[in-house]
Regions:
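Short alpha-helix plus adjacent loop in nuclease-associated cores
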Residues: 110-113
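Ribokinase/PfkB-type carbohydrate-kinase core domain
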Residues: 1-29, 51, 89-104, 116-255, ...
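Short pre-catalytic strand/loop immediately N-terminal to key active-site residues, enriched for Gly-Thr
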Residues: 45-54, 253-266, 286
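A glycine-rich beta-to-alpha transition motif near the start of alpha/beta enzyme domains, typified by
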Residues: 72-100
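Short, small-residue alpha-helix embedded
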Residues: 71, 207-208, 261-285, 289, ...
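Glycine-rich phosphate/adenosyl-contacting loop at the front of the ribokinase-like
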Residues: 1-74, 86
Length: 331
């Protein structure tokens, strides 16, 4: 029997409203490690523009991005029975993302987040509704699953997913822990960590998972591998990214920006999309590292997490034009 989907993404979906601020300030301490966005209190604050983007979120962005790269994708998520939920379904239809695992929750609104853009960075106001989801058992057999952000109410779903993975040993798993999943940590999500084929985190998230102050990349890789993931990708913002398959560590520089980034929302998801899609296509780890930053570069040139996502011909064309220095380096 021919497999219907190459990859099924699992996680919350939202509408993002991007508000571009002009009259704000940023206050930082400890060498710009901790920064605060400041607005005038009890005042009318002007903004430059508003852009509304439906069907976004870590898993949604990956499902859309992988579909643009030519893979057959679907998403298991939940929405409200309202106008915004219908917008999300239409966006998935347009992007050729399978919708049969989208649970419509009557009586609840669709997740709606506000993204405050100032310069090239963003601060996001979030709220996850307490949705009911279709159980993972509904997925039957999937060759790849990508699992990411869900709200605090969804702990039971994590246990259901662990049960599904026990019954489907051949299913490969991409895991990018969201805010609540980082809070739960490997102690409560140990079975998911142990079944993870490829894990995506940034350097700070890796430190948080391991409860360490060390930022040494090899120390972080060793600690995360002990939790179970076979391949790990650690992003480090504009500095580049790292990856490990337990046998070898690599550093990958960023793809050169054609112009200064416009807005960074979705850069990490675009990286995960390029990386994971290459693996689903059967490409080696070193090639996955080349695919990932190209997608991130394209996304930060646009507002929102999806507008800049590349098609496969576009990505391969950019790779052919890449400088000779754009390749993984063993570390």
């Amino acid at each position: 029997m021919k497999q219907k989907y190459d990859l099924i993404a699992i996680g919350d979906t939202t509408i993002d409203a991007f508000i571009k601020l002009t009259e704000a300030s940023v206050h930082c301490r400890l060498g710009h490690k901790y920064c605060e966005l400041c607005l005038s209190f009890a005042d009318k604050v002007p903004y430059e523009s508003l852009t509304v983007v439906p069907a976004v979120g870590n898993s949604s962005n990956l499902a859309v991005g992988a579909a643009r790269l030519g893979l057959k994708t679907a998403i298991l998520t939940a929405i409200g029975a309202d106008y915004y939920g219908r917008q999300i379904l239409e966006a998935y239809r347009r992007e050729k993302v399978g919708r049969e695992f989208v649970k419509i929750n009557k009586g609840l609104p669709t997740n709606y987040h506000f993204v405050l853009n100032y310069e090239a960075e963003r601060t996001i106001l979030i709220k996850h509704q307490e949705y009911r989801y279709y159980e993972p058992a509904r997925l039957a057999k999937a060759p790849w699953i990508y699992f990411s952000s869900m709200g605090e109410h969804a702990l039971g779903f994590h246990h259901q997913l662990a049960k599904y993975l026990r019954a489907h040993r051949d299913t490969k798993v991409g895991f990018n822990p969201g805010t609540f999943q980082l809070k739960l940590g490997p102690a409560k999500l140990g079975e998911i960590y142990r079944r993870t084929t490829v894990m995506f985190v940034n350097r700070e998230e890796a430190q948080r998972i391991l409860k360490t102050r060390s930022s040494d990349i090899k120390t972080l890789f060793r600690g995360l591998h002990r939790l179970g993931p076979k391949i790990i990708a650690i992003t480090d913002g504009p500095k580049g990214a790292y990856a490990s398959d337990e046998k070898q560590y690599y550093f990958m520089p960023k793809y050169p920006d054609p112009k200064p980034p416009l807005e960074r929302t979705g850069a990490g998801d675009a990286f995960s999309t390029g990386f994971l899609s290459a693996l689903v296509y059967g490409r080696p780890l070193t090639e996955a590292l080349r695919w990932a930053p190209v997608n991130s570069m394209a996304v930060v040139q646009e507002i929102g997490a999806q507008k800049g996502l590349l098609t496969k011909p576009q990505l391969l064309s950019l790779l052919r034009k890449a400088p000779k220095s754009y390749k993984p380096k063993k570390i």
